[in-house]
């Protein structure tokens, strides 16, 4: 697990710096970027909740005596665990892309000044 995985995106230094920069310069992309960060934060929270619920299911399964029920639950548990793992990986990739985009914009801003903030688009190709 990398720092990107464990650290909430809203607490990332590059993200916080870019949000402040966009806000301070009244950049049109501020609202959209802020909403993106809020959305990713929500996904992080839901994934954390799903992981905690899965842990609780596992603990409850261990106490089951009915083997056929336990086997059925084990299959469901394994499928949910795999889905959560895939979601965690995708979220980690998304966070990395956002953070790298922030780094690139901040580097460009330091080199060119406020003009670097003109035309920032929030989407797959940019942040």
Residue ranges and their predicted role:
Residues 22-26, 102, 121:
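Generic secondary-structure transition motif, activating predominantly at the C-termini of alpha-helices
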């Amino acid at each position: 697990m990398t720092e990107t995985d464990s650290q909430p995106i809203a607490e990332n230094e590059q993200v916080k710096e870019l949000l402040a920069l966009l806000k301070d310069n009244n950049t049109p992309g501020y609202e959209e970027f802020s909403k993106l960060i809020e959305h990713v934060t929500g996904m992080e929270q839901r994934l954390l909740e799903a992981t905690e619920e899965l842990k609780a299911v596992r603990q409850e399964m261990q106490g089951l005596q009915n083997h056929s029920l336990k086997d059925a639950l084990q299959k469901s548990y394994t499928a949910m665990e795999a889905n959560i793992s895939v979601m965690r990986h995708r979220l980690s990739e998304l966070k990395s892309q956002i953070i790298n985009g922030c780094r690139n914009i901040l580097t460009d801003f330091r080199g060119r000044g406020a003009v670097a903030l003109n035309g920032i688009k929030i989407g797959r190709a940019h942040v």
